[in-house]
């Protein structure tokens, strides 16, 4: 068994270790480089998935527009842009009603009609 003097020495050493190790209740372990890299990759993956979902929704809107039978003007040449400003008009019969349109559609429609 330990004597009282040895027990006091052990207690003083334990107190010194606890007092000098300034953890302040915070976790002592820091993140390793691999954990930081994993979190970075996860953030990039999530933002990439958000972009893919946005693109999928936009392509679905285009597909629905074409499926409605909207007239598509075919032009000679490789340019997809209208040759004249007058050629760039909205198709009146296939516009969304204001109840169905989202804010971006309303902004585009008001700007296009004011010109």
UniProtKB/Swiss-Prot annotation:
Q: Which domain of life is it from?
A: Eukaryota
Transmembrane annotation, as ranges: none
According to the record, the residues making up region (Important for receptor binding) are 51-69
Q: Name one GO cellular component term.
A: extracellular space
* Gene Ontology BP terms: cell-cell signaling; intracellular calcium ion homeostasis; positive regulation of D-glucose import; positive regulation of glycogen biosynthetic process
Pfam families attached to this UniProt entry: Parathyroid
The region annotated as signal peptide is 1-25
Compartmental location = Secreted
From the UniProt record, list the residues forming the propeptide. 26-31
Which InterPro entries is this protein grouped with? PTH, PTH/PTH-rel
* Keyword terms, alphabetized: Cleavage on pair of basic residues, Hormone, Secreted, Signal
- Molecular functions per Gene Ontology: hormone activity; parathyroid hormone receptor binding; peptide hormone receptor binding
Family the UniProt entry places it in: Belongs to the parathyroid hormone family.
What quaternary structure, including any partners, is listed in this protein's UniProt entry?
Interacts with PTH1R (via N-terminal extracellular domain).
Function (record text): Parathyroid hormone elevates calcium level by dissolving the salts in bone and preventing their renal excretion. Acts by binding to its receptor, PTH1R, activating G protein-coupled receptor signaling. Stimulates [1-14C]-2-deoxy-D-glucose (2DG) transport and glycogen synthesis in osteoblastic cells.
What is this protein called in UniProt? Answer: Parathyroid hormone
Q: Which organism is it from?
A: Canis lupus familiaris (Dog)
